[in-house]
Structures are given as structure tokens and as C-alpha cells.
């Protein structure tokens, strides 16, 4: 829609609504020049807008021009812009259809509608559809108004893009958490002569703790608990990798020591600096009435029927500390069917409400000993309740994971 016959002073205009722009808002702080695309078919209106931009923008900017929708599309295919100043009525497109097409082609740009007085209602509709603002041509179309509008539009759009990015990240984290939750075992009732109960409560959306139950080729039950240092997506990814390595190697005939030695070598190749993994792996053989374990900086506790406690821990360091470390499988001759194995990460033993007094391994083990005649899931509940009560109203700062393994004499 050409307006070249109009006098500059007669170009219709309007002011920004106070609710959408306020002089009290801080100016946009950007180190790069603002890239602007001016889409206007009237040479007179285009000239007036350029004069207003030159006088109204305090910072540097680059300006691209187009007199039709197709020309604007051509510009957007070659350059990235921060703001589009858009006349909705062009020779090859009219009304909201113009906005929709430009918005699709420039999804990351702020669009400001430059409206004539006869189509202000359409401009308002465009704002409802996602345009950052609109200006009605006329006497109030001033350099100050246009400069302020451009700055505020870029600022609001930047916030909008950040919110979209954060929402995307949040969705990815939720998806990762859902996948991570599915990795925890759900086969606790499938092992003869053994009652199993395990749980992981992450401090953040994606935790670095894990536990697993694996049946090996010889029929033995392999129980694993691990704790990757740190929190967040990095440790969570390392947790998934650690679990995958252990599961893959458990399908072989390697000993526990050989499995963990190999896992350590594989993880050391991928381990980020300052990350490490504490790990405890136990193997139960009901047919041979045997218990063995391999420890990488992580203890386990064997609770006897009479309440005596044996701490199971080797001198090997956590995984990722020394890629050449040789881990050893240790037998437990004191083991008898009917004994109980308690495994937990330091998120439980280091529960605290003031960062001065910590729950400690001793109190956790005492809780297990006290409830040793209860079902495994009841013992597990009491351990988590103990940690939560000790933590009080303080924020949980570390992942909490525990596994209780109760063995039963054959036939029970």
C-alpha cells in the first residue's frame, strides 16, 4: 500500500501504551550493533523512519531495507536481524498474513508493527500473536518514540528468547530425569532367597548416584551402588556411563575385581577433571552360600543375625583416580544365609541441618541393626526417615541412595 504521495508531516502516528514501555525501564545493554530490518513500501514513510532511527537510537545499529514481503524474506535469508519494523500492508501481502509470514521467517527477531491509523486494530491483533509492539504513524511518530520502542522491543525479546531457552533446558532435564528413573531396577522380587529394597533421592533434578541388581551367567546376584562426585547433568551422564559399563562387563565371566578394573580404565578415559566415582559391588551365590565384594572407595556393612556388624571395604581408591589401579575381589567367610547387607551413599550419612553436626555412618548402621528383623523395604524406609529427620528443614545438598539386601536360608 503506497503512501509516497503523503507529506512527511501528515504520516499518521501513535504512542506506545505505558503498560508496554516505561521510561523507568533500564536501557538495553548490548555490545553489538542492533541489526534492524525496515519493511515499508512507501518511500516517504521509509525515509521518515530512517530519520527517526538516526536521531532516536543512541547506540550503533545496522539497517536493512525492503519494500515488499518477498524482498524482506530475501534479506532474512542472508542476514540475522534483531528487530523488524514492519508495515503490515505491502504490495504482495496484507494484514496479519504479513506478520505471520515474517514471524515464521525471523523467529528470533523482535517485530514492531508500523501501523496506519486505519489498521491499528490489526496491529493490536499482531501484538496478541507475538509482535513486541506497534507504533501508529502520525505526528507522534518521533525519534524519541521509535528509539525507545526499538530498545525496549529488543530487550523484551531477549528476555522472551531466554525464557524459551530455559524452558527447553528444563524440558531436557525433565526428560533426562525420566530416563534416569527408568534405569533404576524394578525387579526386586525376582531373586530367590533374597529380599531387596533400593531407593535413590536426588538433590537436584539429575543425580549422580545409582544402584543396580544384576543376575550373572552363573546364577549369582550382583548388587551395585555408586556415587559420582558433584551434582547436575555432568555427574548424571557419568552415572549412566558407569552403570552401562558395569552391566556390560557383568555379562562376561570376569571376576568382580576384573570388572571394576576394566570399568575404571574405561571411565578414566572419559572422566572430567575433578570427577570420580565411589563404587561398591557385592556378589551373592545362594547355591554356594558365598558373599564376595569389590570396593572402590565405598564401604558396605554386613549385619549378622545377632546384630554384629562387619565393615566391608578395601583399600582401593574411587574410580577415575588412578587409571592403572588393580581392583581385587574379596571374599567374606563370615557370611551366612540370613545375614543382611546395608549399602548407602554419603548423602545419607552426611545429612545435616547446620553443616556442623552430621548424621554419620554409625547412626545409620545402628538404625539398620535395630530394624534388622523387619522386611527390607521397612528397613530402607527407616534409613531415609532417619536422614530426613536429621536434615530437618535444611535443603538436601547431596543425593541419597541406599540398598538393603536381606538373605534367607533356603526354603524361606
Model-assigned labels for residue ranges:
Residues 280, 331-343, 348-412:
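C-terminal catalytic subdomain
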Residues 68, 94-97, 118:
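Acidic catalytic/metal-coordinating carboxylates
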Residues 87, 115:
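Active-site residues of response regulator receiver
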Residues 164-342, 394-412:
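… and, occasionally, acidic/histidine-rich disordered N-termini of signaling adaptors
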Residues 55, 74, 96-108, 125:
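Short amphipathic alpha-helix used as the core "switch/output" element in two-component signaling
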Residues 31, 43-67:
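Two-component/phosphorelay signaling modules centered on CheY-like receiver
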Residues 50, 65-83:
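Acidic, metal-coordinating helix/loop segments flanking the phosphotransfer/catalytic sites
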Amino acid at each position: 500500500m503506497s503512501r509516497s504521495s503523503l507529506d512527511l508531516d501528515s504520516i499518521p502516528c501513535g504512542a506506545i501504551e505505558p503498560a508496554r514501555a516505561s521510561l523507568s525501564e533500564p536501557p538495553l545493554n548490548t555490545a553489538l550493533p542492533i541489526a534492524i530490518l525496515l519493511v515499508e513500501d512507501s518511500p516517504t514513510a521509509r525515509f521518515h523512519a530512517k530519520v527517526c532511527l538516526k536521531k532516536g537510537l543512541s547506540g550503533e545499529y545496522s539497517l536493512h531495507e525492503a519494500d515488499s514481503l518477498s524482498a524482506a524474506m530475501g534479506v532474512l535469508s542472508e542476514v540475522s536481524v534483531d528487530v523488524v519494523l514492519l508495515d503490515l500492508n505491502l504490495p504482495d501481502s496484507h494484514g496479519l498474513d504479513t506478520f505471520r509470514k515474517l514471524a515464521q521467517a525471523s523467529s528470533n527477531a523482535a517485530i514492531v508493527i508500523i501501523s496506519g491509523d486505519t489498521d491499528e486494530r490489526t496491529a493490536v491483533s499482531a501484538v496478541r500473536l507475538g509482535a513486541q509492539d506497534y507504533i501508529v504513524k502520525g505526528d507522534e511518530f518521533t525519534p524519541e518514540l521509535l528509539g525507545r520502542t526499538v530498545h525496549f522491543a529488543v530487550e523484551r525479546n531477549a528476555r522472551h528468547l531466554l525464557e524459551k531457552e530455559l524452558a527447553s533446558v528444563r524440558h531436557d532435564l525433565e526428560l533426562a530425569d525420566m530416563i534416569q528413573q527408568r534405569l533404576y531396577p524394578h525387579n526386586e522380587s525376582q531373586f530367590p532367597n533374597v529380599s531387596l529394597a533400593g531407593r535413590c533421592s536426588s538433590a537436584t533434578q539429575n543425580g549422580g548416584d545409582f544402584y543396580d541388581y544384576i543376575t550373572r551367567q552363573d546364577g549369582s546376584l550382583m548388587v551395585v551402588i555408586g556415587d559420582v562426585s558433584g551434582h547436575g547433568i555432568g555427574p548424571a551422564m557419568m552415572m549412566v556411563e558407569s552403570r552401562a559399563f558395569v552391566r556390560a562387563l557383568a555379562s562376561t565371566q570376569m571376576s568382580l575385581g576384573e570388572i571394576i578394573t576394566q570399568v575404571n580404565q574405561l571411565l578414566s578415559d572419559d572422566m572430567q577433571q575433578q570427577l570420580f566415582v565411589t563404587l561398591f559391588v557385592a556378589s551373592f551365590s545362594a547355591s554356594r552360600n558365598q558373599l564376595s565384594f569389590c570396593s572402590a572407595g565405598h564401604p558396605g556393612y554386613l549385619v549378622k543375625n545377632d546384630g554384629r556388624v562387619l565393615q566391608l571395604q578395601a583399600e582401593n581408591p574411587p574410580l577415575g583416580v588412578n587409571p592403572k589401579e588393580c581392583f581385587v575381589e574379596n571374599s567374606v567367610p563370615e557370611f551366612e544365609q540370613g545375614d543382611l547387607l546395608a549399602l548407602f551413599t554419603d548423602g545419607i550419612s552426611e545429612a545435616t541441618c547446620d553443616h556442623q553436626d552430621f548424621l554419620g555412618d554409625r547412626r545409620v548402621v545402628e538404625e539398620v541393626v535395630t530394624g534388622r528383623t523387619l522386611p527390607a523395604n521397612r528397613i530402607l524406609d527407616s534409613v531415609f526417615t532417619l536422614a530426613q529427620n536429621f536434615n530437618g528443614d535444611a535443603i538436601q545438598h547431596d543425593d541419597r541412595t541406599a540398598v538393603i539386601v536381606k538373605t534367607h536360608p533356603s526354603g524361606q
